[in-house]
Amino acid sequence: MKAASSDQNQKKKRPQGHTASVLDLSNLSSPAPKKAHKKILNDIQWPGSPHSNPEGSSHYGYQEYTPAQFPVANRFTEMMRMSALGILVVMVLNFGSVYSQGKSLRHDVVAASSEGVESITQSDSLNGTVLTNAALQFEEAEQSLWFLQSQGTALKQGTPSVESIPELLRAAQDLSSAAAGFMEFAVALKNPAQPLLSRQPVPRPSLTTPLLTSFEKHFQPAVLKVISANRVLQTAPLSVVPSTLQPELSRAKEEIAQLSELLILFNEAFPVMLQLLGSEHPQHYLVLLENNNELRPGGGFIGSYLLIDLNDGYLDELSFHDVYDVDGRFSEIIPPPEEIATLTDRWGLRDSNLSPDMSLSAQKAQWFLEKEGGPSTDHVITVDLETVRQLLAMIGPVAVEGLQKPLEADQFETVLSYIVESKLSGAESPKTIFNSFIPAVEAQLREGGEGFPLVGLISEMARQKHLALYSKQEDIQAFFERWGMAGKIVAPPANEDVLMVVSTSLGGNKSDAYLSQRVDHHTVLTQSGALLDTLTLTRQNNWSETEKEKVRELLGSYGFKAIDEEVMTILGAGTNVAGLRVYVPQGVSLQDVQGLSGTEVTVRHDEALGLDYFYFKSIVAPGEQQKITLTYELPFGSKNGMKEISSTTHGVCRSLKI
């Protein structure tokens, strides 16, 4: 990595004590943020009631099916619309009952506030003009509300709950005033002195200081107003409005409560975002590019990585590296763990992600990079193919130098893998294509101005565990963990049933792209109080001649006609060979094995996670299916035949009363 110049590393000194901070909201009551699930299960089903057999045992079970490929939704736009509409609902619907005695006045307020929100929700892209106009329209609404407040005596006449009217009016005023503050903050976000993450020579204006100033001046006071208004709304009785409007007021309460939660979360997140942009010190990132068509417990095979330096919001470095370069220069022999000993006799960065806890895998990757002569980094970002696929779906096809047509979301992986595995750019530098692909993606992302959707994509990919973040800085790592972005495995409480199935590709190919897996798990409570789990894994290799022709047709459309059979084997036609770990509670006793010989399954212990796991190999040829069933007794039971247990799979916890 190139050393950054001393000018680039120098940061403008801030006034003493003027650092990004989280607004103290401890004195305001607001609903606590909802905790996100740590992992997603695809198509999980739970029985509504237990099934009993003639022997008196009770059965509980679920089914999970993981297809070879599945789409991921982006919900960020809907979340932003919900937030803006929350303001509109309260400002319009709540006022409706109070303004029923002054229709002309009501019309002025509704029109002004509606126009302001529509400027947010209906514009295709946020720009300075739109945001400025929206702020002016919200200001008009605020002026109307001040006039309304002076008419309190008249408004009280005939009102069922007169004491709530002044509070509702003040809440309405707070909301409209807050909306104007949010617009001012949005203008600062949208119109920095230079584009965020741009490359600019020094001297250059600070990008993070104006953002922090606007955050403290406009956003944080607006948050306080929304929380205060929410507190008033939650205590206001529905009887304050006519019965015909009570359902709408109820919905308005819910919307503003959700908006309040979102703003509190953003208030916590924004100072951390500034830190990550290098607001106080330059930040150094290791981005692991993992191929989840060749699975590893911590994501996928690490074929390449990026080194990124951010300083005061500017991108000072972005460089691409082939993992075999740094591994190849490392002369020390570190024996690999037993489970990957058939792949290599030297452990290196490319095989560092062997823990399903992505934080632990990230730490190991940092260790190997430094051990092998690479730079020290502050943070690690783990990214797999699904994240890139969704990014391309968001920004559109990308034109890459040397290709006959742009790369699309559902094509890029096959095309780039073929170019690399065929060594079209030479055996010494097979990944040269990425030196064109990555800048092309970066340029198109900038041109499209996809800032808000990109934040939503990052959040969604982290939720799906296609992306994970790790930081050496304890406060930032704690933030990642609270937001469910660290990929961390949380140790379960004592006497809880746990199930997590992870895979390590051992076949040297990308056949995991065509491998679907079904997990059937049943818990039986016997009359004696013992708990027996039965786990069935059904693994199907979906590669076929049809898939082969699809690959040939796709590559042919890019001008690649003669596809070598050996390369086709690597792309997915080869036999799927995997080392499987089935994580279970510590102390389980294996009772029976079907589909494998008993000697092929060993019980091992993961000290870092505090869990046992069954380890065995699975071999599935193209077009074939393998079914493996394990029966094991849990180390805890129920003396009286009634006990509450939980089954945790991939981090999602469900409770069953038995």
Model-derived features with residue positions:
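Non-catalytic, solvent-exposed segments at the cell envelope interface
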Residues: 2, 19-27, 37-46, 59-61, ...
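Arg/Lys-rich low-complexity patches in intrinsically disordered regions that function as generic
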Residues: 11-17, 34-35
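N-terminal intrinsically disordered, low-complexity regulatory segments of eukaryotic proteins
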Residues: 1-14
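Sec-dependent N-terminal signal peptides of Gram-positive bacterial secreted proteins and lipoproteins
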Residues: 81-96
